Amino acid sequence: MNKLIVYNTPSWLTAFTTGKGSGVEALGFQLEELALPRQVHSDNVLWMHEAGRPEATDAVITDQPGLPVCVKTADCIPVLLYDTRQRIVAAVHAGWRGTVSRIVQKTVRQMHPLDPKDLHAIIGPGISLQQFEVGDEVYEAFFAAGFPMERIARRFPSSNGKEAWHIDLWDANRFLLQELGVDDIFVEGTCTRTSGDFYSARRETINTGRNYNGIVIKMKSEE
């Protein structure tokens, strides 16, 4: 199996997600050529102008052609952003902690869009509402952070026979983008826990591989 998604985007950029049996090499990149942060479930956002592995960062932004900004996931939600007017791109790692901390909004603000209508978002494969069972403390964290719980949370029967909360991380991040006036939001919709095409920490343990999610501004010669 060689799972690679290349998203439908303007001709001046490439946005992608790699799954099992694939990698950034399929797109002509080497790992050492990426702007790829060492993620810690933070809300830290960093502008990058060259390849590297910055510490304790979960979102990266660039305006440099030829520099892929990437995040790794294995159930968490990847959000890829691009500004069509300024030609700025970003990759965001949004697990539940990052989502509660509104990391996608902090990333958008650091991109300094002239108009939110210029911003476009791709929400890639991640764990679905049906599969993302959480404890009451996670539900309370989203509630305290001002999320619309009637929209993003549901109760489903759990394996112990009781009901448990489930959170829709895709829609939680869509809500955050909509709050800032971003309208063009594409949700890819594949659940990593149920799809064998992608790595899943909940299905395969935390030591499984990782899906790479990236976006790159093409060099002028490639457009």
Task: List where the protein language model places each region.
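Active-site microenvironment for binding and transforming phosphate-containing groups
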Residues: 1-223
